Structure formats: structure tokens, C-alpha cells
């Protein structure tokens, strides 16, 4: 699961759909099958209320990425994969970062969870 949180002052400044699709594709194609396709979810929420730094820069903005995944992925995979993903995210925002103050963050959390997901069944039938 990836949750993207972005400041409202970035509205219209980047292609949110393309960003979400890039991340989902990355998880499908570059993660060595570690993330089951049926479990990949990417969502985004605009932050309308926020304070950044000293609250004196009206153009200051952020995009935060929170990843939650089930426990047990090897540490070396996590390091390699999320370093590469963050590099792709940074490149996605390179032009915007050059034009305005922008903070990008990626946090990864291993979580214990309870699941019921019939999307896996649909994917098996489709293949």
C-alpha cells in the first residue's frame, strides 16, 4: 500500500495519475515478485491544511509517500528497492523541484495486518 500526501499548493503542478501509475508499475515490474500484484494499492490525498518550516514561504510544498507492507521482506531487498523507487520519484519531480521549494519524503513501514482479498482470484482467472 502506498499513500501519497501532497500539499494543495501543488494542484495542477504535476500529473498525479501518472505518478500513481508509475509507482504501481514499479511495484509490479521492478520488485522481483515480492509484492503480490493483487495487493498493490496506490492512493493519494491532498493536504489542504498544513504548515511548512517557518510558515514564511508560500511556495513551500511537500509530497510524502507512506508505504505499508507485510513483515518479512528481506532487509537487502527493502534497501535496494526503496532506494531505487525514491530515485525514480525524485526524478519525476526534478523539474518541479528546480522551480520551487519542494520536500519529498518516503517512509516504509512493515505492518501486521488481517486481510481478505478476492482480487487475487480474479487475477488467477485472467491469466
Predicted regions and their residues:
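A domain-level signal for the structural core that forms small-molecule/cofactor-binding pockets
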Residues: 1-127
Amino acid at each position: 500500500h502506498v499513500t501519497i500526501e501532497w500539499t494543495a499548493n501543488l494542484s495542477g503542478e504535476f500529473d498525479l495519475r501518472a505518478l500513481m501509475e508509475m509507482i504501481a508499475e514499479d511495484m509490479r515490474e521492478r520488485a522481483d515478485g515480492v509484492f503480490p500484484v493483487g495487493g498493490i494499492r496506490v492512493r493519494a490525498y491532498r493536504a489542504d491544511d498544513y504548515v511548512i518550516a517557518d510558515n514564511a514561504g508560500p511556495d513551500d510544498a511537500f509530497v510524502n509517500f507512506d508505504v505499508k507492507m507485510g513483515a518479512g521482506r528481506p532487509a537487502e531487498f527493502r534497501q535496494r528497492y526503496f532506494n531505487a523507487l525514491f530515485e525514480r520519484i525524485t526524478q519525476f519531480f526534478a523539474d518541479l523541484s528546480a522551480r520551487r521549494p519542494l520536500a519529498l519524503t518516503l517512509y516504509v513501514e512493515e505492518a501486521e495486518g488481517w486481510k481478505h482479498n478476492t482480487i487475487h482470484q480474479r487475477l488467477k482467472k485472467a491469466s
